[in-house]
Amino acid sequence: MKEYFQSIVKELFKNIQSDEFLIINFDAEESSFVRLNKGKIRQPGSVKQISVSLSLSNREKRNLKSYIRLNGSLKRDLATLIRTLNYLRRELPDLPKDPYLLFSTSIKSTDVSSTQQVFDDRENLDYIFSKIKSLDLVGIYSSGYIYTGLANSLGQFNWHSDYSFSFDYSIYNESNNAIKLNYSSKNWSNDDFDLILEQGIKKLSILSKPLQTIQKGEYTVYLEPSALNEILDMMSWGGFSYKANKIGTSPLHLLNKGEKSLHQSVSIDENIKDGLSANFNSDGFIKPETINMISNGKFSESLTSPRSSLEYSVDHNASSTSEYPSSIDMSPGKIAEHEILSTINNGIYISNLWYLNFSDRNNGRMTGLTRFGCFVVEAGELVAPINTMRFDDSVYSMLGDNLIGLTEKRELLIDSGSYEERSTSSARLPGAVINNFKMTL
């Protein structure tokens, strides 16, 4: 795939005029997908797709972009790309100047190619089926390479490739109630899969017990990493963005100003080095390996795009234009896995949350529903499933004053989204035990 991109780059740059600057961004994947239902393969398939965006600029800071799907035939694709380039060139003079246009002019080429051993999907699926014979399982197994490339007409060339998989699935009991599970990583481990499945089966057995209705109020709860990920995803809607904090639309703007703080055990990084996303942005700037966004409960550094750096006269850290994290890494705590239930003692175990939204964005307050495998805990034991409940609480409470602690063990959660293409977003998170968690309905 890299050689294919290099061939495109070589030919396109032959067509660039002296007063033009061209950036070529390349995205591709070679993926396998297997849909399972009732523990059997129902729909296997594979996807190989290539996309290229051309960004043409001139000395007057005019810029125009075009996004093209390619078919893998170099001759036909080059003809399409050259026609597109000519279209951009023709339209460019009629566009207004872009005062915040900024791209890298210092040549910093990189090549980060996956060196891990590629696993056999058939072997993995055979192993899965050997373990789920008696289970009603529904899910999607996806795996394969994801490629990202960039080249500009100054001679910079960047390449990133990574191999990963995601098995996103649910297991059902006879009453059609489900436990949702996910196993995703860069390397398959039978032991890791067994552990996740065994924990799911144990929860499924408790899910068969009569539903226990709980009343609205404040509870001690445990948020599994997948549930905590929903909270952090909401925090990321402008929370770490320099521009959003500057104009006051960030849900963490009070944290950014120093008017609020989180628990001192909370540290959150953008960890590009250990994630799946590329270490360069679409303008050719190289991202730091790690950006410490929250340190010991205090706001540390925003994600700042090149556009924001020009608009507000500050340094940038090669963030994307959206200034949204793609590889969240939250530091672990001190609660051992076998201590989670005893730490809750009496409360609620929450496996998943969904339908989250802000109830008071200015104060970092959000609301959402419990989902899939949430249980009453009594005397440190899971005793019964609960009715669906709505929570409404502030991040400054959940990860601040009311945070009892984070778990020692963390999980890598790879975004299983595949709209248009497989996602490269990921999060490595602990679980969280929280006191006075507010259930409202």
Residue ranges and their predicted role:
Residues M1-A278, I286, S295-K298, E381, ...:
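Active-site bordering "gate/hinge" segments
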Residues L255-L441:
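Dual-mode signal for accessory low-complexity, basic/Gly-rich regions
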